[in-house]
A protein has these predicted regions:
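Sequence-level detector for tyrosine residue identity
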Residues: 2, 30, 46, 54, ...
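Acidic surface patches and DE-rich sequence motifs
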Residues: 7, 41, 48, 98, ...
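A solvent-exposed, acidic/Ser-Thr-rich amphipathic alpha-helical stretch
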Residues: 15-16, 20, 33-86
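Short, low-complexity N-terminal intrinsically disordered segments enriched in polar/charged residues
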Residues: 2-34, 38, 42, 141-146
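Generic secretory/membrane-interface signal
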Residues: 1-2, 27, 37, 85, ...
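Alpha-helix C-capping/helix-to-loop hinge sites
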Residues: 24-27, 47, 96
């Protein structure tokens, strides 16, 4: 039978990890560092869905602070979590509004890798455009959008 792993305080490890991910998303929504040092390892590897990659916590903090001077995350909604060993996948919907008027929104997932003490040592985001369509709707020859 499956036995839920718990930490020394009796809190399920899955719940603790979900709480950490929610805190990270909340930091973006509130534009406030509420514990970046507490949730990421010093040598974290963070990869955004569109290629930027940050190879330590200091750079993640700089990116967080600098990005929030240019825009605001208005929605970062968690849809579901999946857990396996030292990894978690979280599915989400994201929307931001930049100071220049640009608005971005997309669906995504993050693959999170944890240390033994439940700090994030790697996080890789994957994004999916919400403007989907069927290229075969009108014919057997695909009609792709530009």
């Amino acid at each position: 039978p499956y036995k839920m792993k718990v930490n020394e305080r009796g809190v399920s490890i899955m719940n603790e990890r979900e709480k950490t991910i929610r805190l990270w998303f909340d930091m973006w929504l509130y534009q406030k560092d509420m514990g970046i040092d507490d949730i990421f390892t010093e040598d974290v590897l963070y990869t955004e869905s569109w290629c930027p990659q940050y190879s330590n916590r200091k750079t993640v903090k700089h990116w967080f602070q600098e990005w929030n001077t240019r825009g605001k995350v208005v929605i970062w909604e968690i849809r579901q979590f999946f857990h396996k060993d030292n990894q978690t996948i979280v599915e989400w919907y994201f929307k931001n509004e930049m100071n220049n008027g640009d608005i971005e929104e997309f669906d995504g997932v993050s693959l999170v890798e944890w240390t033994e003490d439940n700090k994030i040592k790697a996080l890789k985001e994957f994004g999916c455009n919400r403007n989907t369509y069927n290229p075969y709707q009108e014919s057997d020859i695909p009609q792709f959008r530009n």
